[in-house]
Amino acid sequence: MKISMQKADFWKKAAISLLVFTMFFTLMMSETVFAAGLNKDQKRRAEQLTSIFENGTTEIQYGYVERLDDGRGYTCGRAGFTTATGDALEVVEVYTKAVPNNKLKKYLPELRRLAKEESDDTSNLKGFASAWKSLANDKEFRAAQDKVNDHLYYQPAMKRSDNAGLKTALARAVMYDTVIQHGDGDDPDSFYALIKRTNKKAGGSPKDGIDEKKWLNKFLDVRYDDLMNPANHDTRDEWRESVARVDVLRSIAKENNYNLNGPIHVRSNEYGNFVIK
């Protein structure tokens, strides 16, 4: 009987230890996920905001293809991947690894040439647009776009946010939307260039002790100015028509919704009216 009581006591302590460990692990994981970016609902809302700006709908447009005459060839898919900048190429490469025999595989040599030359030429991409559109509901094609989007845009946006000391979900969503449109290159219109200009105007970043809300307001000013007067003249007309996306983001800040809670009401003459839950 004594042995049985000892065993019972052992298992009771083991159960308590396991419970404590589980609670600690869960807490650490939740904090890690938040530190790495946005939570699931915040990320969804950020992506839906960008989808409104890019495609006029809260539904992610995997099958979107259009030539915007902005110097970037075809603009495609959920993040506006383009044939001139190499991200459309990366999507097709990732997709081809998953599905070796696909409709887009034959365009890989030309996509590589266009990416290398940063060319907006689409003369040798006959049938590319229709092939891309036809794969809109393909599970692997969607997964390829999601993977490239996270690798090239979402993760870098969260890293830049961490480096700048940004804590609010809205600020991080603004960073994500900015990198989607401006890219994360080293040109004067790039995402990082805008951050550097903002830091100069604000006297530093939130990581340096600058108030995050004031810094974000400065950043939106800088981005607005860049959209109106981009260094890249090929994008000038297209970008000037997109300044309303900054107005929408600023309106969310004015509503003090820095946690990016739903519902978010988007009211825009340029993009229309939407409710993001």
Swiss-Prot record:
GO terms for cellular component: extracellular region. Its EC number is 3.2.1.132. Aids in the defense against invading fungal pathogens by degrading their cell wall chitosan. InterPro entries: Glyco_hydro_46, Glyco_hydro_46_N, Lysozyme-like_dom_sf. It catalyses: Endohydrolysis of beta-(1->4)-linkages between D-glucosamine residues in a partly acetylated chitosan. This is Chitosanase. Keywords: Glycosidase, Hydrolase, Secreted, Signal. Belongs to the glycosyl hydrolase 46 family. It is found in: Secreted. Pfam families: Glyco_hydro_46. GO terms for biological process: carbohydrate metabolic process. Residues 1-35 form the signal peptide. GO terms for molecular function: chitosanase activity. The keyword Magnesium does not apply. The active site is at residues 54, 70.
